[in-house]
């Protein structure tokens, strides 16, 4: 049996960089990791609860965290940043103060920056969210996968692979279905491959979605 390694961890230091950049003493390391998870979860929950999303796509590509002694810098890469900025001019400031209260950072300043992803559907997280939205609306999984591949081709990628696992279309026996278009060289370390795994809760149960995108 072939052993599958995570494509992002496999390429760290060559085409991939770390999502969290900070240094801590060994005794404080676990606290920092928990804080990072809390930040990421809070941002996702805030967007789900406070923003009306018609397409079902939140548009969060990735959240990068950089820490110094007196500062926490959070960079949110979004495909559709208007969702967070539109409506109220002080929305980001309100968002920042709410997060500061939640994290209880007494001696640290919190700074949030939002960066727009130029081609949203070139990012696997946004594509997986799109597929999840389609599956929730009971669109056929094949139709959802084909539409997702069309969107990535329009964004100008070299290859894409999509995999859905679970009780697809409500069938009693769980199975795995996948589709690939173009090249996805998982063995080539120099190849810039973006990857994500995403879970979606449907009326039939939980489905797992995996997306690999070969950009360059």
Curated annotation (Swiss-Prot):
What CDD domains is this protein classified in? KH-II_30S_S3
A Gene Ontology CC term for this entry? chloroplast
Q: Pfam families annotated for this entry? A: Ribosomal_S3_C
Record-annotated KH type-2 domain positions: 43-118
Location in or out of the cell:
Plastid, Chloroplast
| GO terms, biological process | translation
Q: Quick check: keyword Transit peptide in the entry?
A: no
Which terms are listed as keywords in the entry? Chloroplast, Plastid, Ribonucleoprotein, Ribosomal protein, RNA-binding, rRNA-binding
Origin: domain of life: Eukaryota
Please give the Gene Ontology molecular function terms for this protein: rRNA binding; structural constituent of ribosome
**What does the sequence similarity comment in the record state about its family?**
Belongs to the universal ribosomal protein uS3 family.
Q: Describe the subunit structure.
A: Part of the 30S ribosomal subunit.
In Swiss-Prot or TrEMBL terms, this protein is called Small ribosomal subunit protein uS3c
Source organism per entry reads Phaseolus vulgaris
């Amino acid at each position: 049996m072939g052993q599958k390694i995570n494509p992002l961890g496999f390429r760290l230091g060559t085409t991939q960089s770390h999502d969290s950049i900070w240094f801590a003493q060994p005794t404080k390391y676990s606290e920092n990791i928990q804080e990072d998870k809390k930040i990421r979860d809070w941002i996702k929950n805030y967007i789900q609860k406070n923003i009306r999303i018609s397409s079902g796509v939140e548009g969060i590509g990735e959240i990068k965290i950089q820490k110094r002694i007196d500062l926490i810098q959070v960079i949110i890469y979004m495909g559709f940043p208007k969702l967070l900025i539109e409506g109220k001019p002080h929305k980001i400031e309100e968002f920042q103060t709410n997060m500061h209260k939640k994290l209880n950072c007494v001696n640290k300043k919190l700074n949030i920056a939002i960066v727009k992803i130029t081609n949203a559907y070139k990012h696997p997280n946004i594509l997986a969210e799109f597929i999840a939205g389609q599956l929730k609306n009971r669109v056929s999984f094949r139709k959802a996968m084909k539409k997702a591949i069309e969107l990535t081709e329009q964004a100008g990628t070299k290859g894409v692979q999509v995999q859905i696992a679970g009780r697809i279309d409500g069938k009693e026996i769980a199975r795995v279905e996948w589709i690939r278009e173009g090249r996805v060289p998982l063995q080539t370390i120099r190849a810039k491959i973006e990857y994500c795994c995403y879970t979606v809760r449907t009326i039939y149960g939980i489905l797992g979605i995996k997306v690999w995108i070969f950009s360059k």
